[in-house]
Amino acid sequence: ISAQENMPIILSDSENGTEVADNFIDSKDIAKSYVIGGTYSISNSVERSLPNATRIAGSSRSETNAKIIEEFYKDTDIKNIYVTKDGTKNKNDLIDSLAVGVLAAKNSSPIVLAGNKLDTTQKDVLNTKIIDKVTQIGGLGNENVVEDILDIQEETKYTVETIDELNAAIKRADANDIIKFKP
């Protein structure tokens, strides 16, 4: 998202925060900051030192990923989703996410970080999207995630006759479903 929105990525140090980048931040007159990750990764003091900071964090890497998709990909229609390993088994697996980042930015498409299955929060946010294409990046290890995303995209048709049935169908339906109201 940083390349897509022309936002620099500033890395922070657990002891010195963004000290090495403070001159850059001041010189670029940055008006808005996003802190990605919880307080274990980036302290509250670092967050407070940044201009107009908003923290995007979950209880896990997968939940943080879901919140990033929710925050920066508001449209229902998504051209492509790139699925990469989340680095929990091997931190070197995260290189796939970095490698596909430029392509994802060019296509305005999110990256889904996942192990061998989607997190519930990832499923919830992807359930609100209509995804044209799912692309697995890197080697084996997250094929189940690709299948899960494709399953989420299946269309369900509801035919309802009463307002109560309509309300129930609306609660169950996702972005790919069709509800026919025949009173």
Positions of predicted regions on the chain:
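Extracellular glycan-binding segments that recognize GlcNAc-based cell-wall polysaccharides
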Residues: 1-156
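Acidic Gly/Asp/Thr-rich repetitive segments characteristic of extracellular carbohydrate-active
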Residues: 156-182
